[in-house]
């Protein structure tokens, strides 16, 4: 009987279940979207119960569509939208409030208060993170402060907190396991990534009782088993967990110090494996945990690009310049260059290394000769310029010279972007055969724990290159183009509209 790993990929807009065979090939995929809630401007929430039912639905669908029985599942791996926060009653398993999503800015006031108290360096030095609404800790505090009766229930030990991985393990196991893994813990703003434990001082500052916290485990071990009535009569081990970007790093077999992957999704996320050393950043990068495996923890530097693939959606849906994302490649290749046009897509501010929340998008270099093709090409090029910004920050902070870049995400299908990226970085850009690297990473972690795969070496040998893009631009042109981008970003940061 052939066995498979079931990977649950719980994302920001949809839940997916993907079956992988022993070769790391995809046997089947199922996907289901769920509702987004926007109670106030800048707030984003999900219904944690709807996330759970969507996961149940896609698990059933992928088994059914693939004609695979539950008894053929060797283990389950989970990868998840990071930082999104659920607080639930441990007796009823009912959430006491919506899940507050990573994008949500509703804890801006809490973060501002903490900064004004001079606490930013304390949080940074213990967690590797910035004091930002992005991370989970302030979301927990917000729920306890704003939901009636929550603070009292928490103090009585009746409430549990978890990121989405914890919530799904709790539900799949029928409440037998309240756990998370190192990667998700490292995104909470209350986990000390150096001591590898929840930080009591930070918990006290945010007034979070430690009875709420999940136990932190390795990214690959048997945490619990499914209860049979949640998994079609079978008790299957749940044995791999990683936050989505760390899972992609693992799925790309970036196991060595200095290995880098960039995900071109809605936003862009670059991670560099820094080995067993946690590198502090002076360039606006985050220090985080890459994975915990074999009794050791690997660290990573992470850079965030707020607008990546969503810039192409903007061309399609906002400006209606193109009918489909693939069309952008065709338009970009019709012209030799942008003729000096730069698009800075700072629609929601600038991420790494600028961290300018008040910057807004801008276009520079327009002339009467500017045509649609130049504009589209400049928008695609902006993804690559932002990637170079982050990579240069990583090389500076780590002291590591990067030799190549592994890529994944929706925009990597665009050959123009990949070639321009190689030209701009003067590096080989490696596109893998399997683009589902996030789900694959979770599957690998789950499979290693139960002997489905033997070692990281075996996994590294399974990584297959679909295409490598080699640089084909002279240095003078490369540096002239990048210098123009830096001037465009600088001008964008100067232009600020004051609030009325």
Curated annotation (Swiss-Prot):
A GO CC annotation given for this chain: cytosol
Record-level Gene Ontology MF annotations: ATP binding; glycerol kinase activity
Top-level class of the enzyme under EC nomenclature: transferase
Binding-site residues for sn-glycerol 3-phosphate, renumbered to this chain: 12, 82-83, 134, 244
GO biological process, one term: glycerol metabolic process
Subunit comment: Homotetramer and homodimer (in equilibrium).
Protein name: Glycerol kinase
Biological source species: Staphylococcus saprophyticus subsp. saprophyticus (strain ATCC 15305 / DSM 20229 / NCIMB 8711 / NCTC 7292 / S-41)
């Amino acid at each position: 009987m052939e066995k498979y790993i079931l990977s649950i990929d719980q994302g920001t807009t949809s839940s997916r279940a993907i079956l992988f065979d022993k070769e790391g090939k995809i046997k089947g995929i199922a996907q289901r979207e769920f509702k987004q809630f926007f109670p106030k401007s800048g707030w984003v929430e999900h219904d944690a119960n709807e996330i759970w039912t969507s996961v149940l639905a896609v698990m059933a669908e992928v088994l059914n569509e693939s004609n695979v029985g539950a008894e053929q599942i060797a283990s389950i791996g989970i990868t998840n939208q990071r930082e999104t926060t659920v607080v639930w009653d441990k007796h009823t398993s009912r959430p006491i409030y919506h899940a507050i999503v990573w994008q949500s800015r509703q804890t801006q006031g809490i973060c501002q208060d903490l900064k004004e108290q001079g606490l930013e360096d304390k949080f940074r030095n213990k967690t590797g993170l910035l004091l930002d609404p992005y991370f989970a800790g302030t979301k927990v505090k917000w729920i306890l402060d704003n939901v009636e009766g929550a603070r009292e229930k928490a103090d009585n030990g009746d409430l549990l907190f978890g990121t989405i991985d914890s919530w799904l393990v709790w539900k799949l196991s029928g409440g037998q396991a309240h756990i998370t893994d190192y990667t998700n813990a490292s995104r909470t703003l209350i986990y000390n990534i150096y001591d590898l434990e929840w930080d009591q001082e930070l918990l006290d500052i945010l007034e979070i009782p430690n009875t709420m916290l999940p136990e932190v485990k390795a990214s690959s071990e048997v945490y619990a088993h499914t209860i049979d009535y949640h998994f079609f009569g079978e008790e299957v081990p749940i044995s791999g967990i990683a936050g989505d970007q760390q899972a992609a790093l693992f799925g790309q077999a970036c196991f060595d110090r200095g290995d880098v992957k960039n995900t071109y999704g809605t936003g862009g996320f670059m991670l560099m494996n820094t080995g067993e050393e946690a590198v502090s950043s002076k360039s606006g990068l985050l220090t985080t945990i890459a994975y915990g495996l074999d009794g050791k923890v690997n660290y990573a530097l992470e850079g965030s690009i707020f607008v990546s693939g969503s810039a192409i959606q903007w061309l399609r849906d906002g400006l209606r310049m193109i009918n489909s994302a693939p069309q952008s490649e065709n338009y970009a290749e019709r012209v030799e260059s942008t003729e000096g046009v730069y698009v800075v897509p700072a629609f929601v501010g600038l991420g790494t290394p600028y961290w300018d929340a008040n910057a807004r998008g801008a276009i520079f270099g327009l002339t009467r000769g500017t045509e649609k093709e130049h504009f589209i090409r400049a928008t695609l090029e902006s993804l690559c310029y932002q990637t170079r910004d982050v990579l240069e920050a990583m090389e500076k902070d780590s002291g590591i010279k990067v030799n190549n870049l592994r890529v994944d995400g929706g925009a990597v299908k665009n050959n123009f972007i990949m070639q321009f990226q190689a030209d701009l970085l003067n590096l080989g850009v490696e596109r893998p055969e399997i683009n589902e690297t996030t789900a694959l990473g979770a599957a690998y972690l789950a499979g290693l724990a139960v002997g489905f795969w033997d070692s990281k070496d075996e996994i590294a040998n399974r990584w297959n290159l679909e295409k490598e893009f080699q640089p084909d631009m002279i240095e003078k042109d490369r540096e002239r183009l990048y210098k123009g981008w830096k001037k465009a970003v600088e001008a964008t940061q100067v232009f600020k509209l004051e609030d009325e």
